[in-house]
Amino acid sequence: MPATLHDSTKILSLNTGAQIPQIGLGTWQSKENDAYKAVLTALKDGYRHIDTAAIYRNEDQVGQAIKDSGVPREEIFVTTKLWCTQHHEPEVALDQSLKRLGLDYVDLYLMHWPARLDPAYIKNEDILSVPTKKDGSRAVDITNWNFIKTWELMQELPKTGKTKAVGVSNFSINNLKDLLASQGNKLTPAANQVEIHPLLPQDELINFCKSKGIVVEAYSPLGSTDAPLLKEPVILEIAKKNNVQPGHVVISWHVQRGYVVLPKSVNPDRIKTNRKIFTLSTEDFEAINNISKEKGEKRVVHPNWSPFEVFK
């Protein structure tokens, strides 16, 4: 029997009391005018949650699309992220992001990665880059800085009014435990944005975050070319049975698991498709849960932060 699709309108609550739409538009790898068109399409289609980052180099396009959409700013949940070369100056970095976005504030500001890149290795004054050492490795600094120091600075930002909440991204359970137990910690992160999809379900991390009142956000929810979920036989069979597209199946699985989902696309039809969900049967839901158990887990995004252990 065909499933009944509907636009997702579900809202989750941050530990600040703020409301966050469960499905948002991701803009990673959306370049220049593509990002503008994607955000404009999304907002006109009813999205009210847009996720960007300084390192995406598209904040100006995202901000212009928000302005041109005609949707009141207070109706849109906007997230951006602190890049790793600016861990020592998050307020300066946030000011720069706000200037590029053309906004007075963002709703959520995330530490993009727990590792700091040493700005001493930056070339051509390009702060939004991945500086490398002479041997070509990332200029990761674990000697002079750590993410706890970054968090101690970030947790003061909501008081400025420049962001309504702060959180983290790509944090493992161990790194979250270290942050929460640190002497200078006064604020539990509002969110932890991590890679999640049926080949990397992150059950333990999701449960830990929920136990601490941290909202989980899923990036790369449809996998990528390295994790071709939309061609998985289990996904295709469920899609065929319910007369929906494979993307509907995967996004609906995420939504039923109860966290924020951030599908990325610059294709207008896919942007609209990614907000349409249906209720999976218990049998189908469990079948998707079992994909990683049968095939093994596969991470799509795994940059080398050596010697820092990001995912342990």
Curated annotation (Swiss-Prot):
Where it sits in the cell: the answer is:
Cytoplasm
Supply the PROSITE patterns for this chain.
ALDOKETO_REDUCTASE_1 (PS00798), ALDOKETO_REDUCTASE_2 (PS00062), ALDOKETO_REDUCTASE_3 (PS00063)
Quote the record's binding site residues for NADP(+): 220-274
Which GO cellular component term is one of those annotated? nucleus
* Induction profile: Expression is under the control of GAL4 and REB1, and is both positively controlled by galactose and negatively by glucose. Also induced by salt stress and in response to DNA replication stress.
Query: Active site located where?
Result: 56 (proton donor)
Q: Which residues take part in binding substrate?
A: 112
Site residues (Lowers pKa of active site Tyr), renumbered to this chain: 81
Q: Name one GO biological process term.
A: cellular response to oxidative stress
Q: Which reaction does it catalyse?
A: glycerol + NADP(+) = dihydroxyacetone + NADPH + H(+)
- Keyword Phosphoprotein belongs to the record: yes
pH effects: Optimum pH is 6.5.
Query: What's the name of the protein?
Result: Glycerol 2-dehydrogenase (NADP(+))
